[in-house]
Amino acid sequence: MENKEHHHHHHHHHHHHSNGSYVSNKVSSLADGSRVGNYQIVKTLGEGSFGKVKLAYHVTTGQKVALKIINKKVLAKSDMQGRIEREISYLRLLRHPHIIKLYDVIKSKDEIIMVIEYAGNELFDYIVQRNKMSEQEARRFFQQIISAVEYCHRHKIVHRDLKPENLLLDEHLNVKIADFGLSNIMTDGNFLKTSCGSPNYAAPEVISGKLYAGPEVDVWSCGVILYVMLCRRLPFDDESIPVLFKNISNGVYTLPKFLSPGASDLIKRMLIVNPLNRISIHEIMQDEWFKVDLAEYLVPQDLKQQEQFNKKSGNEENVEEIDDEMVVTLSKTMGYDKDEIYEALESSEDTPAYNEIRNAYILIKDNKSLIKDMKQDNNVTQELDTFLSQSPPTFQQNGDGMKASEDQKKKHSGRRLASSVTQQRTFHQPPFMDQSKEEDSTISILPTSLPQIHRANMLAQGLPAASKISPLVTKKSKTRWHFGIRSRSYPLDVMGEIYIALKNLGAEWAKPSEEDLWTIRVRWKYDSDESRLIEDGVKKIPNLMKIVIQLFQIETNNYLVDFKFDGWESTYGDSTISTNMSEDEMSTFSAYPFLHLTTKLIMELAVNSQGN
């Protein structure tokens, strides 16, 4: 079957043969007992937020895996598909003993099937079965969770939805976190996901619909999880959602007397309402209670090495050989061309494409050092085995892939990493870990000022009046960059102006719902000879571009208008028209008209506002 070959052997041209990656049989017949690729499906394990999860085993090795079946309809617009598949491939690089591994991705016409590590139990079922959990035992689970979360944050992935269903246990009672990186894929481009999965575990800034949900939201959820393990009940729990939201927003909960001072102190610092004052993951790792009996392999490299870094002068760090083996791994996993990877690593240019490659390289490099750590830590040999079996053996096609061909080796022998990459590695604590941080996103969803909108805003019942939202940071010294247009006018006036401009330009829009007053969904006819698509020999022209315009509050009395491309429709009402184009065609096709129309709109707005 050509499917798995596709993953390991394609290079840079991988998006052109879009059919190459499809499984021949239609996968929606994913009945129990059927086969997908090399996997035999056994039964359905459950229904996740993204679709069904099935238990399966690899036909030759018998290894158990779980298949997470994501229906492409749930994902963003078809023209985002390529990016989503790219993000899912990035998740394949995440290797941490306490994160569910993603072994492979199988694509069919309607689904993306993620082949992931199988862990049979949920942590919380285990807690319920034990009548009492000692602090030692709870701390061991907590250390594993925090170490995994730190690892993902370091690689710029925030979970955003840590809750009991995502905390699994393997047969050695080790925690495995599921769904890392998925909330991203679901929300991308629409700054917010309105439904937050389980409100009991959600941070105040998440339930109040604040725009920016950074790594701090995971700290809050971990605080709730620690509380539940130690107290066997939820810190925030109420029949009434408004009351629940009010308690979370105000951080109202009680700590039982039996907790040790160390534990209750840590919980208090994690459940701080203002995300800026909340403890960071790195600070948790330095907490005294946390550090008791901490397994060596759970401490990230940089925390161990920090002291040495501080002593060294920066210069001698800068020369570092590029690891050829890692380049090979990278080109296999992500489908980059090897030369492309060397180019990115040697260049000091700051382009998105280069950064993507550098991040992936650093990620693989970290995996290596993590494995080295685990080898030194004698207690974890069995864990190491499961950690290293990156995927069912048959996936390691033939050994040739791992050895760079000789001439390739000669060509690149002793190549040097551009110093900027090394520096990034040496001081790679991401900006959000920096304690001196002053800058932070102050974008928030618009407070509602009209009575009928207030009613519609179901959250308002239980939340402090939205108008009290004040900017988190009022430091004015630094120029801020924003996408879209900024405005200091009254929000309703801004919306009015936009509607007038759209009307003048002949665009149409959907009637906004009361909850969604600050979002305009626009369809705009774009006439151009290039917008012809040939489909089944018939010319169809997708000439209606969809744009979403959204108004956000950046600071008090300072608003931002955001424009987002939202796909094409043809006048025939057949919105599926774009799916036959490859992702490349789609993106080259859409960028220019989108910029063209938004520029027209911005000009129109400028003309109008001067006229007033």
Swiss-Prot record:
It is an enzyme of class 2 (transferase). This is Carbon catabolite-derepressing protein kinase. The keyword RNA-binding does not apply. The lineage of its organism: Eukaryota, Fungi, Dikarya, Ascomycota, Saccharomycotina. SUPFAM superfamilies: KA1-like (SSF103243), Protein kinase-like (PK-like) (SSF56112). Essential for release from glucose repression. It interacts and has functional relationship to the regulatory protein SNF4. Could phosphorylate CAT8. It is a peripheral membrane protein. It comes from Candida glabrata (strain ATCC 2001 / BCRC 20586 / JCM 3761 / NBRC 0622 / NRRL Y-65 / CBS 138). One of its GO terms (molecular function) is protein serine kinase activity. Residues 1-25, 388-426 are annotated as: Disordered. It catalyses: L-seryl-[protein] + ATP = O-phospho-L-seryl-[protein] + ADP + H(+); L-threonyl-[protein] + ATP = O-phospho-L-threonyl-[protein] + ADP + H(+). The gene is SNF1. The active site is at D161. InterPro entries: AMPK_C, KA1/Ssp2_C, Kinase-like_dom_sf, Prot_kinase_dom, Protein_kinase_ATP_BS, Ser/Thr_kinase_AS, SNF1_UBA.
